[in-house]
Amino acid sequence: MKNGESSIIKFNQKTLKFVLIIYLVSCIASLINAITMKVTGINDYVTTSAIVILTAAIVIYGIVFRICYVWTVGKNEFNMKAFNATKGVILFITYFHYILLDVILHSDSQWMIIFYFIILGALFFDLKMVSISMVL
């Protein structure tokens, strides 16, 4: 890091890995929830193929997050262009995962989880990203 970097950039560099890991853990928790619903018979709409699709999506998220992280903080220098792209990727994955869960689980209470992901996105202190999240 250079001496002239702002405190927000330093904060974003330190929290990026944390936020990406929390996003991935949250997606894995949703997979565990879907599997539990299928095994216990709580939700009859959850199929084995849906579980496989959800698992594949989460593996892809992990790969994409890893690529974004390496691209953003690689070479011991914070790449702002890559960071902005990573925020866009996070926003896309947030809504894609929400829609995927909505299709798989057929639950009326799924809308509540979107606020959790918006709050995680707010850790980047990016008003534009949070505003877009709320509008979508």
Regions found by a protein language model. Name each.
Residues 118-129:
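Short helix-perturbing small/polar motifs within transmembrane alpha-helices
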Residues 129-136:
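Central hydrophobic cores of alpha-helical transmembrane segments
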Residues 15:
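Glycan-recognition and catalytic regions of carbohydrate-active enzymes
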Residues 18-25:
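Select subsegments of transmembrane alpha-helices in polytopic membrane proteins
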Residues 27-106, 113-119:
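Hydrophobic transmembrane alpha-helices and their membrane-interface boundaries in multi-pass
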Residues 1-12:
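Short, Lys/Arg-rich, polar N-terminal cytosolic tail immediately upstream
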